[in-house]
């Protein structure tokens, strides 16, 4: 079996069985099945996590860790591919099937190399298959499990497929790459009365939760434009729920969104600004509120020294000019040990057509992540596997 055939088999098998959050029994069983014949120690250091440790046989003091996320999304697949999801309402729409496939292929490569070419891989290797990247940050539970201390891992690498980059493009940078995130929930409390009783009532005495929410959203947008002039910062509220009927003032409103920044200073400024404009909006309408900035993910911040060490081995690496305002729980690993995260392009190269194979899989991704038609061809994963091979050769 060629490496491409191996990658394709893993990816399509996993694509058929998407599972969510920490509830990953079929995915875990599949990964354990691939690892079973390999000369590695398989452990489960925390719930729904699979780790595979390979002893290089060189007396190495430390291990290199490779991470792959396993969870899918609650999306009904509409690709029409022959290997579409068999789990209704669930889909690998963020490429985690590809991430797992690259890691599994890298594991079989490590096993074969240690057996057939002793000493070529000089460091021990730890593969980490983690749950819940899309939800509660499964990486955090992995870090708290002690697995990195147990196997003396002193660096970690990971990938994310990225349709915004041309297929096969490898991109990263030293320092901040992806944003810090915080989900923000606001509950505005007013008083519901029939609209007929509001005639002549000043806005400040209206207790109109919907109006307070509207005022907040307009002012918050202006705030983010102002803060974003200094450094990247975005706060968008995609959820707005207010009232129960059309002919009564909304007594309650719920506004929820996400804040993305790269520095603690900007996070503090944005959080203070949101509270200030919310104070003003509620004071202007006679409402009160509860505000919760949920703990999100830290920024993905590539270790400068580790990046400088690995970059010479990756001659095709393109530098990301500006950090991206997406979030990834790989950041928790980087707070625990030095790490570098890479983006792997899956998009259509300029001037190329995009044919599909006999199973309905396009050569290049044409849909964004988290959409019901997101697909890519496994040939792109060969690039990621090749990068892992080169990283694992470093002493």
Q: Where in this protein do the model-derived segments appear?
A:
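Conserved acidic residues
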Residues: 39, 153-154, 338
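Short Gly/Pro-enriched turn/cap motifs at secondary-structure boundaries
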Residues: 43, 133, 174-179, 322-323, ...
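Metal-dependent amide/peptide-bond hydrolase catalytic core
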Residues: 195, 200, 210-395
């Amino acid at each position: 079996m060629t490496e491409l055939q191996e990658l394709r088999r893993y990816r399509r098998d996993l694509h058929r069985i998407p599972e969510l959050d920490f509830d990953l029994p079929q995915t875990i069983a599949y990964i354990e099945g691939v690892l079973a014949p390999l000369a590695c120690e398989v452990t489960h250091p925390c719930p729904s996590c699979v780790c595979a440790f390979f002893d290089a046989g060189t007396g190495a003091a430390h291990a290199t860790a490779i991470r792959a996320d396993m969870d899918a999304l609650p999306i009904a697949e509409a690709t029409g591919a022959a290997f579409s999801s068999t789990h209704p309402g669930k889909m690998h729409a963020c490429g985690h099937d590809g991430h797992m496939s690259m890691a599994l292929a890298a594991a079989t490569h490590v096993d074969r190399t240690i057996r057939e070419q002793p000493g070529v891989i000089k460091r021990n290797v730890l593969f980490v298959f983690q749950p819940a990247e899309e939800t509660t940050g499964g990486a955090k539970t992995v870090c708290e499990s002690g697995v990195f201390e147990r196997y003396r891992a002193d660096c970690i690498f990971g990938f994310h497929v990225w349709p915004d980059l041309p297929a096969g493009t490898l991109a990263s940078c030293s320092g901040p790459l992806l944003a810090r995130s915080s989900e923000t929930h606001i509950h505005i409390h007013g008083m519901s009365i029939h609209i007929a009783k509001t005639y002549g009532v000043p806005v400040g005495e209206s207790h109109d939760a919907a109006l307070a929410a509207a005022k907040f959203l307009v002012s918050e947008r202006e705030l983010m434009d102002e803060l974003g002039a200094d450094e990247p910062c975005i706060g968008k509220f995609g959820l707005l729920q207010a009232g129960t009927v059309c002919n009564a003032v909304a007594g309650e409103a719920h506004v929820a969104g996400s804040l993305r920044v790269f520095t603690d200073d900007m996070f503090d400024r944005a959080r203070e600004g949101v509270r200030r404009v919310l104070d003003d909006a509620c004071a202007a309408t006679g409402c009160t509120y509860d505000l919760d900035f949920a703990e999100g993910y830290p920024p993905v911040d590539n270790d400068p020294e580790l990046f400088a060490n690995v970059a010479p081995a990756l001659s095709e690496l393109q530098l990301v000019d500006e950090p991206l305002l997406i979030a990834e729980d790989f950041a928790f690993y980087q707070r625990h040990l030095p790490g570098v995260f890479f983006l792997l392009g899956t998009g259509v190269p300029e001037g190329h057509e995009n044919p599909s194979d006999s199973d309905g899989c396009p050569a290049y991704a044409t849909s964004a992540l988290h959409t019901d038609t997101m697909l890519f061809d496994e040939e792109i994963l060969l690039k990621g596997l090749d990068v892992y091979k080169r990283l694992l050769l470093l002493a």
